[in-house]
Amino acid sequence: MKPEKKLPVLDLISAEMKTVVNTLQPDLPPWPATGTIAEQRQYYTLERRFWNAGAPEMATRAYMVPTKYGQVETRLFCPQPDSPATLFYLHGGGFILGNLDTHDRIMRLLASYSQCTVIGIDYTLSPEARFPQAIEEIVAACCYFHQQAEDYQINMSRIGFAGDSAGAMLALASALWLRDKQIDCGKVAGVLLWYGLYGLRDSVTRRLLGGVWDGLTQQDLQMYEEAYLSNDADRESPYYCLFNNDLTREVPPCFIAGAEFDPLLDDSRLLYQTLAAHQQPCEFKLYPGTLHAFLHYSRMMKTADEALRDGAQFFTAQL
């Protein structure tokens, strides 16, 4: 669809979302639109520093975890000594951007609101790593902490996965991977999914929404996919197109959050409708007036803070 045929999104978003969009960081260089992925990663990390400030303090530990691909960094956020469960967080960034620093505030708030240990996994980015390496690294980290739970003083009897955007896909894909391959890493009590993509190739919201303001034009989405997948056949893998997986049985309880003006919104709606149709435990909540990636902006947006609280509350209700 031609850009002029799309909705005038920036006129329709909420007042608090407009404030975020109009927030300038004078010390930031311009976005390197034609730069290398390395330059874009560097910019993204710098840009997120402002939004990560002021997060709650808590005990934090970092560990390198062995996988068949090499060492992967993890970061543990421990709000209390006797955590009722452990929640693994997978950051978004289109599979090509992001790290544990860019999503630090999100993980800290999630730990604070749930009172569970949150473990961020710094999976290898694409295109250096191709599907399914990130999922295999996440699963390896889960297995490692399950085996070493006593040494690390964490509760791995009940676990969960959480993620935003591409991280939401990785969160649900990892939970399904554990189920399908019958890997025991503790009971998966819940999965928290904020504005993820789950396998649609086209949709109404993808046609009407997406632009330079969110980095989710049709061309952007194609670029992320080409960086992440190894070959064309991967598009139909049940761990990339999650709608090709069996969503009729033993899916952990899912909290599915949608942003009103997100081109990926129909992915979330379809996931919810599919799970609900097959009596799989799930909850869907739409956050009005929001753009994709709004979870980052809790410094300025009450809605972002609410979305994190909602996810934390859903998870603790499953314990």
Curated annotation (Swiss-Prot):
Localization terms from the record: Cytoplasm
Pfam families on file: Abhydrolase_3 (PF07859)
Matches recorded under InterPro entries: AB_hydrolase_3 (IPR013094), AB_hydrolase_fold (IPR029058), Acetyl_esterase (IPR023508), GDXG_lipolytic_enzyme (IPR050300), Lipase_GDXG_HIS_AS (IPR002168), Lipase_GDXG_put_SER_AS (IPR033140)
Motif Involved in the stabilization of the negatively charged intermediate by the formation of the oxyanion hole location, chain numbering: 91-93
One CC-aspect GO term: cytoplasm
Active site, per annotation: 165, 262, 292
UniProt GO MF annotations: carboxylic ester hydrolase activity
Domain of life: Bacteria
Record keywords, A-Z: Cytoplasm, Hydrolase, Serine esterase
Gene3D superfamilies membership: alpha/beta hydrolase
Major location category of this protein: cytoplasm
EC code: 3.1.1.-
Annotated family: Belongs to the 'GDXG' lipolytic enzyme family.
NCBIfam families per UniProt: PRK10162.1
Purpose: Displays esterase activity towards short chain fatty esters (acyl chain length of up to 8 carbons). Able to hydrolyze triacetylglycerol (triacetin) and tributyrylglycerol (tributyrin), but not trioleylglycerol (triolein) or cholesterol oleate. Negatively regulates MalT activity by antagonizing maltotriose binding. Inhibits MelA galactosidase activity.
Assembly information from the UniProt record: Homodimer. Interacts with MalT and MelA.
Name listed for the protein in its UniProt record: Acetyl esterase
The organism of origin for this protein: Escherichia coli O17:K52:H18 (strain UMN026 / ExPEC)
Native organism taxonomy: Bacteria, Pseudomonadati, Pseudomonadota, Gammaproteobacteria, Enterobacterales
Gene name linked to the record: aes
